[in-house]
Amino acid sequence: MKLCFNEATTLENSNLKLDLELCEKHGYDYIEIRTMDKLPEYLKDHSLDDLAEYFQTHHIKPLALNALVFFNNRDEKGHNEIITEFKGMMETCKTLGVKYVVAVPLVTEQKIVKEEIKKSSVDVLTELSDIAEPYGVKIALEFVGHPQCTVNTFEQAYEIVNTVNRDNVGLVLDSFHFHAMGSNIESLKQADGKKIFIYHIDDTEDFPIGFLTDEDRVWPGQGAIDLDAHLSALKEIGFSDVVSVELFRPEYYKLTAEEAIQTAKKTTVDVVSKYFSM
């Protein structure tokens, strides 16, 4: 299992340049690049070609652009903006050699029936699949374990991906999101491991279903999530690609970037190495 760093983990105490240097120093294999803040900040003083050269001359490689946000159930203007943004991402992926784009479903106070959510998600993901295919890029749908997210359980996301039925459309499995809205471990055990593209590891304080927010995340192995169950299920269904550590805890943003990156690796390896060689 390869080790990846998700830049949310140092959102307020680092930048892309420093994340790369420290992840390279501490033996990470991949990085997920945040396209909404850290990449634009980097591009103020550097070019995409500079970034591509860094990846070509170092061990660490780009795993994913994170993320295409709120892709489904948009009005015409919103949909057109999503398509334009995604096409730009494809060019970035081509320049940098990025394998995946993470797609995050709409979060809204508006109540939308599940059938409408599914239809829109399937339609848009199919359109994105067509755009991504010539680039060799895959789309990883990340359900979000929050009541206001239109796709908030593993079961709902898996059904959408199965309906799309494209080799370049799969899932992000995030342990926090899986736990936060009570997704069923039996559903994961019955899933096709090839449909899971990226595994996000994290843990959480022990709040009830529906109350958890990203700030409640803690280092892997230090919270209430049954990570052993998640990892053993992933092993059972044949997933062994990449584990990406992703936290959003304000307390951890007070650490130095190096402390956070080192601790993220140690806690992740301690938990994952019981099931996978790293």
Swiss-Prot record:
Cofactor note: Binds 1 divalent metal cation per subunit. Can use Mn(2+), Fe(2+) or Co(2+).
GO molecular function annotations of the record: isomerase activity; metal ion binding
Protein residues bound to a divalent metal cation: E142, D174, H200, E246
Pathway per the UniProt entry: Polyol metabolism; myo-inositol degradation into acetyl-CoA
Record keyword Iron present: yes
Enzyme class: isomerase
Annotated catalysed reactions: scyllo-inosose = scyllo-inosine
Annotated family: Belongs to the IolI family.
Protein name per the record: Inosose isomerase
Organism: Bacillus subtilis (strain 168)
Lineage: Bacteria, Bacillati, Bacillota, Bacilli, Bacillales
Name of the encoding gene: iolI
